[in-house]
């Protein structure tokens, strides 16, 4: 029997992963990608000699012993790349000079927190004890993997359940020290509503040198996986936007591109945006209530929605790689007031800037409608981006002497930019938490790994799974091919 053919829509990490494992296991795959490069949202680009990186913050799997390490090894994702382990997760500062340094050395963190607030020793010790306990477990694999991975979590299951139900903000309210209370609430990328389990998982990993950085960033990671895919005999057609998934008798049979050309295969896999796949490419013909409920529940503002980049002719030696800077007075962005800024300093990756230079990024929540309305007038849209970059630079100049005068390159990424790059629904770069009424189903089955009534069709990536992360996307591609091998009575292989 001839090898089954698979068309994959999108060369993000989910699509590339599905392509690699498909090729290894005897499927004939081809990827259609709308952009001139692979990676999807795992991307970086150059401005005036500086590299601006969109995706990677903390990459799990840079040290042995986790499922992410194994998948990056299988995909060649880190081949030839140096990796960097962070000494701190984040440093939170006030204008008065108070600092909460989230050291990745747990002993050092515990001592630092107890010095900040001796009266909070009990709650501090509880947090650090949980981080230490989770060190011996691959928690993300347990939460997203099969029954075997879940069973391995049994010794810590009670703690996992407990801390998954407490937000970081609510945990912080238990501290009596006002500064520690407000600082602790911001440690997970300054996101709101995040279970305290998540920073515990991050700290457990970082204390072992994991959840670090691949030197070269997002594009280096994606480029390595693309190289593996091509070396395995795969094919990528760039600048090839899929407009429609072709269906005959409720079976997916091919795709139609923007130029009108049609391409056919035995199986169709979408690694593209979930909404665009279900409601545009398939015209909403194969939808269940939980999918509609999920996409109707989108938040009005999105994390990582605005990213402001600066290329600076200035060194930032000794500065933390991540900072939350509380402001002496609120800053107004998109008609909303913020009392702090989330800042990333790329002084640990020399490939991002020349000698004596550094890239700095500021991340802010954003509303798609605000920028979509502005984009109707291109001049006004660009003026507002410049005003925003200037406004934020003024604030950073107070923290970093000479910041404004050393700026050589600027870029501002809005939700409209993300729609242009990836077709992401309303500019979201990652999925949002499922509403309560479908959270159990999404946790168990994902949002849309398959669609009701449609055969020979599958989805991979963050949107299919309903959970964010580069590792999540890569695992979804692997898991799909493993399932296809089972369906076809093949032994699943991870190498040729």
Regions inferred by a protein language model and the residue ranges of each:
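C-terminal segments that line or cap access tunnels to active or ligand-binding sites in enzymes
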Residues: 313-416, 420
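Active-site-proximal substrate-binding core of FAD-dependent oxidoreductases
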Residues: 247, 486-496
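Helical element adjacent to the flavin cofactor pocket in flavoenzyme catalytic cores
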Residues: 204-252
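Mid-domain catalytic core of redox enzymes
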Residues: 213, 243-355
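Rossmann-like flavin
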Residues: 95-197
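A glycine-rich dinucleotide-binding beta-alpha-beta segment and adjacent secondary-structure elements
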Residues: 178-191, 402-466
